[in-house]
A protein has these predicted regions:
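C-terminal cap of metal-dependent C-N hydrolases
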Residues: 182-185, 239-289
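Short, positively charged
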Residues: 145, 211-212, 255-260
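Residue-level signal for pocket-adjacent positions within structured domains
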Residues: 62-65, 121, 137, 141, ...
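His/Asp/Glu-enriched, well-ordered alpha-helical/loop segment
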Residues: 63-90, 160-161, 165-167, 172-247
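Histidine/acidic residue-rich metal-binding segments in metalloenzymes
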Residues: 2-167
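Flexible loop residues that form catalytic
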Residues: 20, 98, 172, 248, ...
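Short amphipathic alpha-helical segments
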Residues: 28, 107-108, 179-181, 255-257
Length: 289
């Protein structure tokens, strides 16, 4: 366990662990130590023992594709245990990387009971499901794995309703050599910083399923609130923090247009409508188009 109090004194935004913590005693101790520090903690609910050697969500598609499956209870049992810890200790927790319909339901019920939790899912879990894995594209091997269609629809509705507070990018770059292997041997993850907003807009907003404000709340306003931060605003005389986005700009996702040194995305080589043109932040502004 790191020096939580000393880090809190340095005014860090919060704490997180990119890997699941299977030790419930450690989780309980973390929550107890964090309670007086007034800093959020983000945890990924996942039981590594139930994950085993799985590489995609267990179910019909995993059988058809001949790939070892990961049961949904690898997530939901971990959520249930974590919620019990939160209820006992009272420390606010952000649940990262939700990927199952049952996980959404557990979060919904916990919020109705008044537990101090927030939650997020990733943008790729909103746009894709296990049916996409039939291509065996290694960029579709994610952690947690893509859910079934019912999981995808539950996540979409939960984000729109605010049960799932935020959309995470979970940008995970890998080299060409690391991802140019068989699906089951590839490390899990895909890039997304440059792709998430255009594709979410193209598939959800341009189609009329979501409003622009609903998408922006899930990508910007509510994530800030999950971290106990003040959402960005436009105030005369203050440093700008804005994104200039052209929803009609068409481009091809390739080595010339992607700013990342990694190309591990299932949208590589595809035409995308919508592009971030420029960023403004208190640190610097940057042209991206």
């Amino acid at each position: 366990m790191t020096e939580l109090a000393e880090l809190a004194e340095l005014e860090i935004a919060g704490f997180a662990d990119g890997h699941p913590i299977a030790n419930l005693l450690l989780i309980r101790r973390l929550l107890e130590y964090l309670r007086p520090l007034n800093r959020p903690i983000a945890l990924w609910p996942c039981d590594p023992q139930l994950v085993g050697n799985g590489v995609m969500r267990e179910g019909h598609d995993s059988i058809v594709f001949g790939l070892p499956g990961i049961p949904a209870i690898a997530e939901t049992t971990a959520i249930a245990a974590l919620l019990e810890c939160v209820e006992e200790v009272g420390t606010p927790v952000h649940l990262m990387r939700l990927s199952t319909a049952r996980g959404v339901e557990l979060v919904r019920l916990a919020k109705q009971r008044g537990l101090p939790i927030t939650a997020s899912t990733t943008w790729m879990h909103l746009l894709l499901n296990t049916a996409s894995i039939g291509s065996y594209d290694p960029s579709l091997r994610l952690n947690p794995p893509l859910g079934r269609y019912a999981d995808q629809q539950a996540l979409l509705q939960a984000v729109k309703d605010g049960v799932v507070d935020a959309i995470a990018i979970d940008h995970s770059p890998y080299t060409y050599e690391e991802k140019t292997v068989a699906f089951a041997e590839a490390p899990p993850g895909a890039i997304g910083l440059q792709l998430a907003l255009p594709l979410l807009w193209q598939i959800l907003v341009a189609s009329g399923q979501w409003s622009a404000l609903e998408l922006w709340a899930a990508l910007s306003t509510r994530p800030a609130l999950c971290l106990s931060q003040t959402p960005a605003s436009i105030t005369p005389g203050q440093a700008a923090e804005m994104v200039l986005f052209n929803p009609h700009q068409s481009w091809i996702a390739d080595s010339q247009t992607l700013k990342s040194r990694s190309m591990n995305t299932p949208w590589l080589g595809q035409a995308i409508t919508g592009q971030v043109i420029k960023l403004w932040s208190p640190i610097a502004s940057q042209e991206t188009g």
